[in-house]
Amino acid sequence: YTLTAEIHYPTYFHRRGMVAAAREGDKENPEWRSDGSQFYIVWGKTYGGGMMERIRQRVKNSTNPPIELALEHEDTYWEVGGTPHLDGQYTIFGEVIDGLQTIDEIQLAETDENDRPLYDFRIIKAYILKE
């Protein structure tokens, strides 16, 4: 099953530790509907200097309608890291606020040909925090 996209960009963006709903590609899913059961935790890398300008152009040229990356996020991508090329295209619904070292370990797990871990990882405890 799928869910209506709830993209609240630039409020929520793909900095390291954010949790977002996976989805099918744009051709199969032009409404960007989110998968009801699959998600990803953003890791990415840090970006600096001219790299952000190249990513900004790439995103603008590859999205329809064109998405303009927010300049105010550049320091976060420089210091914390993330995946700016995904901004404005996926539903972000959570954030890892403790345990990023565990996420670092998960990303090193052995995977199959579809980049899925050979063994399942389970979230044992999650909390809903109000802003």
Model-derived features with residue positions:
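Cross-family detector of peptidyl-prolyl cis-trans isomerase
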Residues: 1-131
